[in-house]
Amino acid sequence: MEKFQGYLEFDGARQQSFLYPLFFREYIYVLAYDHGLNRLNRNRSILFENVDYEKKYSSLIVKRLILRMYEQNRLIIPTKNLNQNYFFGHTSLFYYQMISVLFAVIVEIPFSLRLGSSFEGKQLKKSYNLQSIHSIFPFLEDKLSHFNYVLDVVIPYPIHLEILVQTLRYRVKDASSLHFFRFCLYEYCNWKDFSIKKKSILNPRFFLFLYNSHVCEYESIFFFLRKRSSHLRSTSYEVLFERILFYGKIQHFFKVFVKNFPAILGLLKDPLIHYVRYHGRCILATKDTPLLMNKWKYYFVNLWQCYFSVWFQSQKVNINQLSKDNLEFLGYLSSLRLNPLVVRSQMLENSFLIDNVRIKLDSKIPISSIIGSLAKDKFCNVLGHPISKAVWTDSSDSDILNRFVRISRNISHYYSGSSKKKNLYRIKYILRLCCVKTLARKHKSTVRAFLKRLGSGLLEEFLTGEDQVLSLIFPRSYYASKRLYRVRIWYLDILYLNDLVNHE
């Protein structure tokens, strides 16, 4: 953060949110390259191979392209066929991707500085483990066990392109950046496929920045609810909501509810809501009755549609009863499990038994969806029977083995919080046998003959690294009794969603 601060102290552009001059600064391309442009498609996947993309990248080409925009009244990048127009040996689609990610990096830097300055002196700045995806689950274990219902909401996409531009207008002050931003969106984006689940020419980094900016817009309703509730406690991100329109909406909400809808205001006095947003979805957990949950659903849908221009379909808001329904959350199936307990109480000479029930959050692995994802990537068939990975037979034996071991360890690491490890062992078995079949196919042998020739030591690499570490942490008796395999373990170093989660 201090490094970015030093780069952007050249004038008052940072204080006034003037971003357009940064496109023509020499050092900004070095900064953008270091900030992550060279790692645009770095392999964070556990199933797929690296795309040879970063070798084509050149920050000089991006700057050259921006400068050439002013040489003609029409840009050098035609829009009819992005894949067949070449400039310096690259397609027009490639150039748009480079410009879009550069725009995202330049816009991210001032906001990162402002966000970091707002947390100065606060304890949150040192809590790096909050970045982990698994850090959400211990929170849910403590909170969801006291709730009855959950609203599972699929976050909608903006119905019009101009809404995204209007969202940035309250944060970016100079018109030049907005015009450049609007031009890129209108000219090069296929808005019929504007979905995070579909293949789009939008760069992922560029898309996620726009998407999160827009989501923060209609998440502002929760600031109003927070003022009406003594229980709603959330991290304050004031820097993301510094705009006049937002405060105007909050005041308007308050006036409308107080004057015209006193009955509705009673619903908001003590809602006791916990809100989590993740992977294009969000959940709202509460202790309300089914009638009140339907009211919440109705009010949220209408507020987002009427005030934030978001086409929010009511069928994308599901009401789940935690004691009966499973909640699909970050690749886990979560539900409440009732554990009966018998407590023996003794008073003087009399003793009696008390039946008690303990509510516990149960997190399970969605084995059917994971097997479907493995089948789609040719690790097994739809029934879960392992098959050989034919496309990897050209690699060396060590490379094939390392690929399968890496996939197995990542899956084991991510799903270590499952309360039932049987499904996890089944997934690891599929990958282990798929590895053996792939090696046997490469050497034109059968699985039995291949294992007999090399021995069972070939598969010892599949022993996960966390098993070896946990054996040193826990007592030997505890580890030897196999109780460790029934314990849920949440890790604080998981920063990316597993590829098997909602994989299409």
Swiss-Prot record:
Subcellular location per the Swiss-Prot or TrEMBL entry: Plastid, Chloroplast
GO (cellular component) term, any one: chloroplast
Keywords assigned: Chloroplast, mRNA processing, Plastid, RNA-binding, tRNA processing
Keyword tRNA processing: yes
Gene Ontology terms for molecular function: RNA binding
Gene Ontology biological process terms from the UniProt entry: mRNA processing; RNA splicing; tRNA processing
Keyword Chloroplast among record annotations: yes
Function description: Usually encoded in the trnK tRNA gene intron. Probably assists in splicing its own and other chloroplast group II introns.
PANTHER family cross-referenced by the UniProt entry: MATURASE K (PTHR34811:SF1)
Family: Belongs to the intron maturase 2 family. MatK subfamily.
Protein name: Maturase K
